[in-house]
């Protein structure tokens, strides 16, 4: 470079040449220019070293001085992270027409040069995206958006230059000449879009910049990140198919389809944020292991996508649970597991809305295609009706916490009404609590239950009414339907008139008087598929439970035991909650009774926020399965197979101002 410069000076006429016009004239007095590194719309970057200290090598950016120069320097000063180029100093020439930004020299290659000579593997792409997201999160925390994120501005540092000799990808972001503070106008009036954007930069710009020259948040960098993913995965030719009004075109069945769907949202407000995207399970190795351990379930879902659905229990926030069919799953409502291995693609996730959107695009064709368009719309509507009429055959429950999947459980027919035998068993156990089903024929159900106990197992459910009549007419246990059928016409006809005599008991509408809507209804425990009893506001109407059990309610990591339920072991059989508010639960005899102090305040959150509890959480025990679980109204489950401990899947997961209940399984019964 020095020889070139000297030749250029020699070719000039010294009497007409003004040395001040040379941008390198000033910097050459203290620095030795080695070579040019890059050239852009605003200036050039050179590799140089000090004359007095040849070991001090740096990169010098030479640009015409303007207000953008000072902004770039201000942003560089704020960045103190290994993922960004280091800033050293700023110098000017005598007339202040040129500025010289002295920065760290990065020994390595740019992403652009690597893409031209090599194809990245899926694992490498995932690691690069993760590192870029970390850099974008750091920028957002500083209130800065890069605005010019592209392969030319991403440098990969050689391993021998990094002091930490590890196998991780070391990348650095450079060129903050177009950076802006978040919420600042993107395009300044004095600088036109055409002048600040080269052809390469325009390919990575978000639609709001290309169409409106507006944009004031970090979602601009997320769109550019998606463009970089497309180029790393499929090349620049695929990225060139991008149009401002549409999402870029790329192969549908790809490992990165869902990530790109999150990046390529044409509406900036709907585009995912960097701090949200980095928490995606795609970047979590533990979720990959979870996918491999439960691959049979996901394979089943692929084969039976119309007959299955997944219920997700996200323990991070209240009300985040969702249920959807497998062909409607998107990362907006359910995080699926992605694999980093080659030739393994995620479950197909095309929603009905996307199908309709694709069909609607046909409406822009010529009129001769209108008939085809209408036919496809009708076919689409028929598909919706068919899907709505399909009955769910299998459910998969997935427990998720901190973006890590904890368990996946298949359940058959999870929601079904209890059988008559179950209801009779339930009524037996509910006698001690003075509660029963809210049904107009409670006396008939009790007679049916008694008859079912004495009858053989071969009797069908359709003969229940006959068995009730036999029990009503005779007290003997010997039932002979064949003999009674011969004598039925003469003998049982008069008794048939007798039930009208029992019509006065039809004044049992007073029994309906118990609009005992106070008395709770049995429901289905989603964990065990068995009827359970929900306590109403009258807490003393709970079922009988096992006593003499040592129970402890702690969080998963054992942090401070913000809420502890334990058995005191004294003669009064008292269960208590130890907390600042002094709340407790008393076990008297065979029934739980709750203190009024439960309406106090309980500090259950890690950050110290107060939560108000009216009652306690739902409490389930399945004696036969030896399983114990808590459940809150927001479907946050706490389950353990130990008899002495309950493990919480979410410390402090109980929400503020929430109503809690207590559950007991019907399989428990009195001792």
Swiss-Prot record:
Keywords from the UniProt entry: ATP-binding, Kinase, Magnesium, Membrane, Metal-binding, Nucleotide-binding, Serine/threonine-protein kinase, Transferase, Transmembrane, Transmembrane helix
Entry's Gene Ontology BP terms: smoothened signaling pathway
PROSITE patterns: PROTEIN_KINASE_DOM (PS50011), PROTEIN_KINASE_ST (PS00108)
Highest rank taxon of the organism: Eukaryota
Compositional bias annotation for Pro residues: 491-513
Membrane topology field: Single-pass membrane protein
GO molecular function: ATP binding; metal ion binding; protein serine kinase activity; protein serine/threonine kinase activity
Reaction equations catalysed: L-seryl-[protein] + ATP = O-phospho-L-seryl-[protein] + ADP + H(+); L-threonyl-[protein] + ATP = O-phospho-L-threonyl-[protein] + ADP + H(+)
Low complexity biased stretches: 427-490
Record-annotated Protein kinase domain positions: 31-283
Positions of the UniProt region annotated as Disordered: 410-523
Segments traversing the membrane: 369-389
Catalytic residues as annotated in Swiss-Prot or TrEMBL: 148
An example Gene Ontology CC term for this record: membrane
Keyword Protein biosynthesis carried by entry: no
Amino-acid positions noted as binding ATP in the UniProt annotation, renumbered to this chain: 37-45, 61
Enzyme Commission number(s) of this protein: 2.7.11.1
Subcellular location, principal: membrane
Cofactor: Mg(2+)
Subcellular location: Membrane
UniProt record similarity statement: Belongs to the protein kinase superfamily. STE Ser/Thr protein kinase family.
Protein's UniProt name: Probable serine/threonine-protein kinase DDB_G0286627
Organism phylogeny: Eukaryota, Amoebozoa, Evosea, Eumycetozoa, Dictyostelia
